[in-house]
C-alpha cells in the first residue's frame, strides 16, 4: 500500500511538467534574449479592454520594419471612410517605381493596381513597392506620422520609404515604435470609431490573409485558434510581428513582438518568436 501511495505521489509531482511543457511567457522572453544576444520587446494586450497582460521592454523603441504596413493601410481606410479615397481607384506606376521585393506589384506594370489591391499586396505579401505607392497617397512618411498623431499615438514615427526604413541603426529613433504604442494603435484601428466597421473588417481580413508569416506564431498555432498578423524584417537582426490571437477562432488579444541588435540568423529569429508565441498560447489562461 505504501508503495502505491509513493507511486501516486511521484506521478502527481510530474503532472505540472506534463501540462506545461513551455516556460511562462516572461521566462521564455528572457531565455530568447540570452540565446539571441539581442533585445526583445513584447506586449500582450486584451483586445476588448486594452488591459496589458504581459509586457517586456514594452516602452523601448524598436524598428517597425514592415509591420508599419498595417498602420499604413489603416490610414488609407480612414481616407476611404472620409470620402477622400476609394479602394477601387486604379494607380498606374512605372518600372522605376519598383523597389526590392515587390512580388505582386512587379506583375502589374502594364495594368496597374487598385488601392485595395495594393493594400492586400502590402499586408499579405509584404510588397514594398505597393507600400510606397500607398505611402504617396497619405502624404509620405510625414503624412503617416501625422495620422498617427491624430489618433493619439505620439510615439510611433515613420521617416523613410521602403526599403531604407529597414536599416535599424542602433540608437536611431527613425522608423520606430514601441510594443505598447503599436498595440494601442492597432487596437484603436480595430475597435474604436477611428475606422468604420466595414473598414475594420477589411483591415482585419487582410491580416488574416497574411501569406508570409508561416514560420512565426502560425507555426505553433493549435487547431481552432484565430490569428491575423503582419511581420517585418530588417537589418542588424531586426524582426517583428503584430498579431491578433485567440482560441475558438476568436480574436481575443493583441500580441506585438520585436527583436533587434542580434547576430542571429533569420531562421533563429523566427524560431525565437515562435517560441514566445508557444509560451503565450500554452499559458493563455493565466
From Swiss-Prot:
Binding site for substrate: 230-232
Record field: catalytic activity: a beta-lactam + H2O = a substituted beta-amino acid
Record-annotated disulphide pairs: 73-119
GO biological processes: beta-lactam antibiotic catabolic process; response to antibiotic
Keyword entries, A-Z: Antibiotic resistance, Disulfide bond, Hydrolase, Signal
Transmembrane annotation, as ranges: none
GO molecular function term, any single one: beta-lactamase activity
Pfam family, one: Beta-lactamase2
Positions annotated as active site in the UniProt record: 66, 164
InterPro entries documented for this protein: Beta-lactam/transpept-like (IPR012338), Beta-lactam_cat (IPR045155), Beta-lactam_class-A (IPR000871), Beta-lactam_class-A_AS (IPR023650)
Record's signal peptide: 1-21
EC number: 3.5.2.6
Enzyme class: hydrolase
Other observations noted: The class A beta-lactamase family has a specific amino-acid numbering system, sometimes called Ambler or ABL numbering and often misspelt as Amber. A multiple sequence alignment was used to derive a consensus sequence and then the consensus was numbered taking into account insertions and deletions. This allows use of identical numbers, e.g. for active site residues, despite differences in protein length. UniProt always uses natural numbering of residues, hence there appear to be differences in numbering between this entry and some papers.
Family: Belongs to the class-A beta-lactamase family.
Function per UniProt: SHV enzymes hydrolyze broad spectrum cephalosporins notably cefotaxime and ceftazidime.
Protein name: Beta-lactamase SHV-8
Amino acid at each position: 500500500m505504501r508503495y502505491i501511495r509513493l507511486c501516486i505521489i511521484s506521478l502527481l509531482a510530474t503532472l505540472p511538467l506534463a501540462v506545461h511543457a513551455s516556460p511562462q511567457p516572461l521566462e521564455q522572453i528572457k531565455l530568447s534574449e540570452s540565446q539571441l544576444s539581442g533585445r526583445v520587446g513584447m506586449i500582450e494586450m486584451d483586445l476588448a479592454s486594452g488591459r496589458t497582460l504581459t509586457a517586456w521592454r514594452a516602452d523601448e523603441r524598436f524598428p517597425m520594419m514592415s509591420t508599419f504596413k498595417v498602420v499604413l493601410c489603416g490610414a488609407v481606410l480612414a481616407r476611404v471612410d472620409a470620402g477622400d479615397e476609394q479602394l477601387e481607384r486604379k494607380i498606374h506606376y512605372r518600372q522605376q517605381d519598383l523597389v526590392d521585393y515587390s512580388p505582386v506589384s512587379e506583375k502589374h506594370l502594364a495594368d496597374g493596381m487598385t488601392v485595395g489591391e495594393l493594400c492586400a499586396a502590402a499586408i499579405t505579401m509584404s510588397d514594398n513597392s505597393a507600400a510606397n505607392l500607398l505611402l504617396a497617397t497619405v502624404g509620405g512618411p510625414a503624412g503617416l506620422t501625422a495620422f498617427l498623431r491624430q489618433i493619439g499615438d505620439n510615439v510611433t514615427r515613420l521617416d523613410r520609404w521602403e526599403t531604407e526604413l529597414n536599416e535599424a541603426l542602433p540608437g536611431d529613433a527613425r522608423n520606430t515604435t514601441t510594443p505598447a504604442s503599436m498595440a494601442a494603435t492597432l487596437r484603436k484601428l480595430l475597435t474604436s470609431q477611428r475606422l468604420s466597421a466595414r473598414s475594420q473588417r477589411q483591415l482585419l481580413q487582410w491580416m488574416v490573409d497574411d501569406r508570409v508569416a508561416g514560420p512565426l506564431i502560425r507555426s505553433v498555432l493549435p487547431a481552432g485558434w484565430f490569428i491575423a498578423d503582419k511581420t517585418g524584417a530588417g537589418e542588424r537582426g531586426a524582426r517583428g510581428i503584430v498579431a491578433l490571437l485567440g482560441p475558438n477562432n476568436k480574436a481575443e488579444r493583441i500580441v506585438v513582438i520585436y527583436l533587434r541588435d542580434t547576430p542571429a540568423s533569420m531562421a533563429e529569429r523566427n524560431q525565437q518568436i515562435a517560441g514566445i508565441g508557444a509560451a503565450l498560447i500554452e499559458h493563455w489562461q493565466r
